[in-house]
Amino acid sequence: MITINTYALQKRRTFAIISHPDAGKTTLTEKFLLNGKIIRTSGTIKARRSKKYAKSDWMEIEKKKGISITTSVIQIPYNRYLINILDTPGHQDFSEDTYRVLTAVDFCVMIVDAAKGVEERTRKLIHVARTHRTPIITFINKLDRNSLDPIEILDQLEIELKIKCSPIIWPISCGKAFKGIYHIYNNLVYFYSYKTSEGINDTNNFLLKTCCLNDVFLDKIIGLELAQEFREEVELVNSIYKAFNKRIFLESDLTPIFFGSALKNFGVNFLMQGILDWAPSPVFKKSNIRKVQPYEKNFSGFVFKIQANMDLRHRDRMAFIRIVSGKYRKRMKLYHVRIKKYIIQTEVFSFVAGDRFIIETAYPGDIIGFHSYNSIKIGDTFTEGEKLKFFGIPNFAPELFRLVSLVDPFHKKKLLKGLTQLSEEGAIQVFKPYENNELILGAIGSLQFDIVIERLKIEYNIFILVHKVNIFSIRWISSNSLDTLSTFKNQNKSCLALDINNHLVYLASSEINLRLVQSRYPDIIFNVTCEN
């Protein structure tokens, strides 16, 4: 007999949407909200003049700049399932947030712009996802615009991303000639209409006109010549691409391919049904002790994200926790493993972008949030008492650095608080040099500095300037010998700093400097990442 807990597990799907910027990530997320009847119209980025913003872009800065800069957590009920979506920033300057999110999901939906094919950001994200053996479902978007040949796109996926493709949906032409899609597994053609209004749930309108591949109705709708060409193309596709195999997909070696237009909500319903039918329910996560299975009785979960000032009126900080095992119950006692203390949260939330809802129960796969007291950090584990720690939530060595100066020097204490909170949520990295009181910011991309300056101004009323500093890169320092580490510290004080978690860091002024110090101290470990 299936228990309530097992049933709850089977009915959950937790995934990240990943893509290159402007491939349609936020638009697709909103169509999920639309189809799940969470919203009635979508506020697309281009509608900013009418004060309609993307629902998943909830921060003021996101609305102002028209881009996603932080991961949005969204829970949607759909066809008796509960879908947990993490809509990640597409911009490469916010890649750290995306990398952390990949540790909290069970699979990914990858969006590919049909006009551009595989892009640089996509390559990097898929490399990380496949390193974790994360299953990938592919949605090729914007078929109603000028696009590459579908077979060319699939060739790019197979060659550049080294993953086998299995088409579920196949398009009838593309761009201005786009006529619709064919579902290979139910043998039905669905016709496309350019009259469809964006932002309205028109799924049913598409389904009114359907026919089988060999139906004469297809010849009448798209023309005999095109219909015959399309039938031959489908025959070719079926002969050269692998049939869908769920086992190979779950091993991350095969990706099912869906085509459509997220903006027009065309083909999105088939993607959503594929997620329900084939994507994994919550899976195990590795800890320092063992694999933790989702069906275990006792609660466990880890913090993969902290967001400061979700509610500016209350200056709150929200910790986002992926539940790995057990069941969360209202006011249950949780053990904060790192600080060795029990806590009881009076309010625990689920999310739809910037909106939050108090919940009383939650299961593995769910993303819950609670108000974060200052001792909660990214990577922290919560259990019912077991002393374990989940792996895989690192900080990466920044690529750009800036020195901070205050417009008003009397706000130093306030600045430290603001930067500490922003660094704890992963918006920026902060380093404090050994030999002075300066503060150095580290980022993956320059836009991160702009965002931090803006958020300090809006959320903390602090005004800062940033200046270039002579730092090429940083490495986190460790050694198996305390004496060796002590000697290294004494001899290199001017090049050392502490990060926000008081981990020792070496500040390299150049690539040559880094190579020299590494060769001079062979017993010192220079780490590119640091586990939270």
UniProtKB/Swiss-Prot annotation:
Which keywords appear in this protein's UniProt record, sorted alphabetically? Cytoplasm, GTP-binding, Nucleotide-binding, Protein biosynthesis
Record-level GO BP terms? regulation of translational termination
The record's section on CDD domains has:
RF3
A GO CC term attached to the entry: cytosol
**Domain tr-type G, residue spans:** 10-283
> Which Gene Ontology molecular-function terms are recorded?
GTP binding; GTPase activity; guanosine tetraphosphate binding; translation release factor activity, codon nonspecific; translation release factor activity, codon specific
**Residues reported in the UniProt entry to bind GTP:** 19-26, 87-91, 141-144
Q: Which Pfam families match?
A: EF-G_D2, GTP_EFTU, RF3_C
Localization terms from the record: Cytoplasm
Q: Which InterPro entries match?
A: EF-G-like_DII, EFG_III/V, G_TR_CS, P-loop_NTPase, PrfC, RF3_C, RF3_dom_3_sf, RF3_GTP-bd
Q: Which domain of life is it from?
A: Bacteria
**In which broad location class does this protein mainly occur, judging by the first location in its UniProt entry?**
cytoplasm
Q: What does this protein do?
A: Increases the formation of ribosomal termination complexes and stimulates activities of RF-1 and RF-2. It binds guanine nucleotides and has strong preference for UGA stop codons. It may interact directly with the ribosome. The stimulation of RF-1 and RF-2 is significantly reduced by GTP and GDP, but not by GMP.
Q: Tell me the protein family, please.
A: Belongs to the TRAFAC class translation factor GTPase superfamily. Classic translation factor GTPase family. PrfC subfamily.
User: PANTHER family in the record, alphabetically?
Assistant: PEPTIDE CHAIN RELEASE FACTOR RF3
- By what name is this protein known? Peptide chain release factor 3
Question: Which organism does this record belong to?
Answer: Buchnera aphidicola subsp. Baizongia pistaciae (strain Bp)
